[in-house]
């Protein structure tokens, strides 16, 4: 991705690390004890060779088909100084996905500030009109697994202990949100679903195979 000055895989898995090395991909081994991906990213970002970077991006491993445009849009939220932390979301137009706990939903303010992330359906739809009828007025949003941080915000995030809401929802972004850190959300075009279940793994393998990507299983 040309939007990045440098990309590296951060992992605590020797299997993943060995595969990356065989493909010529930069990789950094980390502690196996991190409570979240952001904590893992912070460990690597604090190493001497990465301390010169002022904006750090975290592309999560369960978003293998993330588009470059989504990465760029997220980084731009932080790079222009508007937000300490940035992330992105895509319109959610399926009633089934709206109630699926593996699909993370979010609500944001008119200025783009994240109000809450949840596995539950937010905002709650009191009547039974199809979601698609309400998209233009107030879209339902699916969170896409990428973050950008200023170095200071990244350090502030990982200095916090895992929060009650973070533990309840198993969503790391609730930790800084609960502590008052401002998270900006940009809305992007359609994004491929993330990988959260074994069915998702099989679906993704089929899709990658159709694109000519070899299997490393």
Language-model regions, residue ranges each:
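Short, acidic, metal-binding catalytic loop of nucleotide-sugar glycosyltransferases
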Residues: 1-4
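Conserved beta-strand segments of alpha/beta enzyme cores
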Residues: 6, 26, 113, 182-184
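Short phosphate-binding loop-to-helix
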Residues: 8, 14-59, 63-73
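Structured catalytic cores of enzymes that bind and process phosphorylated ligands/cofactors
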Residues: 11-12, 53, 74, 83-88, ...
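Conserved core of the sugar-phosphate nucleotidyltransferase
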Residues: 67-163
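Conserved alpha/beta core of the MobA/IspD/sugar-nucleotide pyrophosphorylase nucleotidyltransferase superfamily
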Residues: 131-217
